[in-house]
């Protein structure tokens, strides 16, 4: 595989604990870095959903942080193991999204992961 896609809902400004556990178990010294580079040159693509709308994830928004900032730990891990960090695919406002918006997001998702 040339690409690793991590798809998850955003809970409390982070990824679910199970994804963090996966990172701890898989991205290890001797396999992903420090002597071996199994992920080097591969692309890391995040697919993330948020219940809150995008306006809340701005410097001047309710959460005072951007999604780019909140997802930066994934970018740092990608850099550490020699991966290419791709622009995340975000679907925001899922708590109130309508059918038309959801259908468009689904079509955009297919394009994003097949790109």
Where are these regions (language model features)?
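Helix-loop-strand module that forms the ligand-binding subsite of alpha/beta enzymes
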Residues: 1-75
């Amino acid at each position: 595989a040339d690409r690793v896609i991590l798809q998850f809902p955003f809970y409390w400004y982070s990824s679910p604990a199970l994804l963090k556990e996966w990172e701890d178990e898989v991205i290890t010294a001797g396999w992903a870095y420090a002597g071996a580079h199994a992920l080097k040159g591969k692309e890391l693509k995040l697919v993330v959903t948020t219940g809150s709308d995008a306006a809340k994830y701005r410097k001047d928004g309710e959460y005072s942080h951007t999604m780019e900032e909140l997802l930066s730990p994934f970018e740092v891990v990608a850099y550490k193991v020699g991966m290419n960090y791709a622009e995340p695919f975000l679907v925001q406002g899922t708590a109130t999204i309508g059918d038309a918006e959801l259908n468009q997001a689904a079509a955009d998702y297919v394009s994003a992961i097949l790109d």
